[in-house]
Each structure stands twice: as C-alpha cells, then as structure tokens.
From Swiss-Prot:
It is a single-pass membrane protein. Phosphorylation/dephosphorylation on Ser-70 regulates anti-apoptotic activity. Growth factor-stimulated phosphorylation on Ser-70 by PKC is required for the anti-apoptosis activity and occurs during the G2/M phase of the cell cycle. In the absence of growth factors, BCL2 appears to be phosphorylated by other protein kinases such as ERKs and stress-activated kinases. Phosphorylated by MAPK8/JNK1 at Thr-69, Ser-70 and Ser-84, which stimulates starvation-induced autophagy. Dephosphorylated by protein phosphatase 2A (PP2A). A motif (BH1) lies at residues 133-152. The modification Phosphothreonine is found at residue 69. The BH4 motif is required for anti-apoptotic activity and for interaction with RAF1 and EGLN3. BH1 and BH2 domains are required for the interaction with BAX and for anti-apoptotic activity. GO terms for biological process: actin filament organization; animal organ morphogenesis; apoptotic mitochondrial changes; apoptotic process; autophagy; axon regeneration; axonogenesis; B cell apoptotic process. Forms homodimers, and heterodimers with BAX, BAD, BAK and Bcl-X(L). Heterodimerization with BAX requires intact BH1 and BH2 motifs, and is necessary for anti-apoptotic activity. Component of the complex, at least composed of LRPPRC, BECN1 and BCL2; the interactions prevent BECN1 from forming an autophagy-inducing complex with PIK3C3. Interacts with EI24. Also interacts with APAF1, BBC3, BCL2L1, BNIPL, MRPL41 and TP53BP2. Binding to FKBP8 seems to target BCL2 to the mitochondria and probably interferes with the binding of BCL2 to its targets. Interacts with BAG1 in an ATP-dependent manner. This is Apoptosis regulator Bcl-2. It is found in: Mitochondrion outer membrane; Nucleus membrane; Endoplasmic reticulum membrane; Cytoplasm.
Length: 236
C-alpha cells in the first residue's frame, strides 16, 4: 500500500465515501458533487446533493454544477499541502470496522436514532455534544470508528426524516473535526496505513475489545428543552 507521508490522506474523501456507503446500505444514493466521483444523478429538487431510492435513480447530470456549489469545496481549496489519494483498502477497513461496531451496538443505535429528534436548528448541537464526549478522555482508533459510525447514523436519520440537506452539513462538520482535532493524532500513530495494518482482514478482528479497549454506552438525556446525546466510553 502506498504511504501517505507526513501530510496524510484526504480526510474529506474518507468522510464522503463513508457517508455514501452508509446511505447506500439504506437504499439511498448520495451525490457528493466531487469532480473525481462517479457522474452525478439529477436531483428531484434543487440542491447540492440528492437522495433517491436506488430503484428511482434518474439519468446523470453534469458534475461541475454541484461541484461548484458544494459547501465542502472550500476545505479542498484551503487544504494546504497536497494530500495523498486514499487507497481503497483504507475505505474497506473503515467500513468493516463501522459495520462491526454497528452490529455490536445495534440496539443502542436503534434507540439513539429514535430519540435524536434532529432538526436543522438542533443538528449542530447534537453533533458537537456527542463528539466532545466521545473524545473527552483521549483518542484511539476505536473512538475514531465510533465517530464515523455516529456521523453515519445522523446522516441516515436526517434522510429518513426528509431533511436530506443536513447531510451536507454533517459531512462538513466531520471533515472539519478530523482536520482540526484528530489529524495530528492519526499521523502521530502511523496514519490510516497503521490502522489498516493493525486491523485489516489478515490481522486481528476489527472490533475486538482487546484493541478497542472500551465499552460503549450511547445514551440520551433530556435537559430542559434540549436533548444531550452522550457517547460514553469506559475502559475495561
């Protein structure tokens, strides 16, 4: 596998492809507006991204229109040093880890989804509260996997509640958080290449508690008029 060097891989690409994968599991197609992605599908209503059941996909439209308007494009323009393309094995390993996490905590995720009560006005607060709690005691690969899976849950719930434009924002928040708060830790710990080497298909199980070193509790607490969602991780 190609080495990313000190600058690392493009976090935006990792986020976008992960969200696309999670939505596709539920039968939704997400048009990212990425110039390097597959051709875009026509949206049923004006917008940056479109969500359609796979059985109702419409013919492709020119990708440049959505690419110019995507709120994520400034992250690329201001990314600084050139980032390395993300090897497919990184996406595959992260997806497998996320799926394993989701299976282990299926009941918790189902409860969380039903109680998120996302709206365009509350989504940012929900995201910030969970992520702050998730990494309060430090960073490890298990918490990074949980971070991606939580973002996927928020995106799926947004689409289920007919608020698909929120996915634009969630993808942006995830990318910004990775760039500002997690990128240094990832690079200091061998980068995504190390994640693949440690937890890839030929190595130990992707979600073995021996490497995750945590027990996850996803809980919701009502405080006044606001719901505070916490992802509490405790060491074994």
């Amino acid at each position: 596998m190609a080495q990313a060097g000190r600058t690392g891989y493009d976090n935006r690409e990792i986020v976008m492809k992960y969200i696309h994968y999670k939505l596709s599991q539920r039968g939704y197609e997400w048009d990212t507006g990425d110039e390097d992605s597959a051709p875009l599908r026509a949206a049923p209503t004006p917008g940056i991204f479109s969500f359609q059941p796979e059985s109702n996909r419409t013919p492709a439209v020119h990708r440049d229109t959505a690419a110019r308007t995507s709120p994520l494009r400034p992250l690329v323009a201001n990314a600084g040093p050139a980032l390395s393309p993300v090897p497919p094995v990184v996406h595959l390993t992260l997806r497998r880890a996320g799926d394993d996490f989701s299976r282990r905590y299926r009941r918790d995720f189902a409860e969380m989804s039903s109680q998120l009560h996302l709206t365009p006005f509350t989504a940012r607060g929900r995201f910030a509260t969970v992520v702050e709690e998730l990494f309060r005691d430090g960073v490890n690969w298990g918490r990074i996997v949980a971070f991606f899976e939580f973002g996927g849950v928020m995106c799926v719930e947004s689409v289920n509640r007919e608020m698909s434009p929120l996915v634009d924002n969630i993808a942006l928040w995830m990318t910004e958080y990775l760039n500002r708060h997690l990128h240094t830790w990832i690079q200091d710990n061998g980068g995504w290449d190390a994640f693949v080497e440690l937890y890839g298909p030929s190595m130990r199980p992707l979600f073995d508690f021996s490497w995750l070193s945590l027990k996850t509790l996803l809980s919701l607490a009502l405080v006044g008029a606001c719901i505070t969602l916490g992802a509490y991780l405790g060491h074994k």
